[in-house]
């Protein structure tokens, strides 16, 4: 059952360290009916490999520059920019020359569970372990 809430993400949402960047689950499918919300922080050059998943994903850049690849297009965006990726579309991102941060919003209830499982992997886990978790949650490497 979901309920309204107010939270302080830095004190109530510990970061999950995934492939060199941190993701805080602000709102999961356990808290809301149709959306999940995340705060992601990353150092220069970090970000996921090209992938797709069945859920929509929307990013709102808070600080730093971030390069987003969607399909065959690449764009560098900064604070105040919004990027929306339709479910099923190939995409990726890389943090630019400085530490960056964005909010992301996903449809459905799958992303938070995937991030929590990825965050539980050892920091030196092989890429195949990350890939196996992602596949279990409906994400495909592309």
Please report, for each region that a protein language model flagged, where it lies by residue.
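A hydrophobic/aromatic-rich effector-binding and dimerization subdomain
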Residues: 103-129
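Short histidine-centered beta-strand/loop micro-motifs
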Residues: 27-29, 47-53, 94-95
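Glycine- and acidic-residue-biased ligand/ion/polar-headgroup-sensing regions
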Residues: 55-66, 71
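Short acidic-glycine-tyrosine-enriched beta hairpin
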Residues: 8-9, 60, 72-90
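Ligand-binding loop in jelly-roll beta-barrel domains
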Residues: 31, 67, 79, 87-112
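Conserved short histidine dyad/triad with adjacent acidic residue
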Residues: 9, 37-52
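A short, N-terminal "cap"/entry segment at the start of jelly-roll beta-barrel domains
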Residues: 1-34, 120-142
């Amino acid at each position: 059952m979901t309920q309204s809430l107010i939270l302080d993400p830095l004190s109530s949402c510990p970061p999950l360290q995934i492939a060199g960047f941190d993701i805080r689950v602000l709102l999961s499918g356990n808290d809301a009916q149709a959306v999940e919300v995340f705060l992601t922080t990353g150092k220069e050059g970090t970000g996921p490999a090209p992938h797709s998943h069945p859920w929509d994903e929307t990013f709102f850049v808070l600080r730093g520059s971030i390069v987003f690849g969607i399909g065959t297009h690449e764009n560098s965006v900064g604070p105040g920019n919004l990027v929306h990726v339709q479910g099923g579309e190939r995409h990726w991102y890389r943090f630019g020359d400085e530490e960056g941060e964005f909010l992301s919003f996903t449809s459905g209830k799958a992303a938070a569970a995937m991030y929590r499982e990825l965050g539980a992997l050892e920091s030196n886990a092989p890429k195949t372990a990350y890939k196996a978790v992602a596949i279990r949650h409906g994400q495909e490497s592309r």
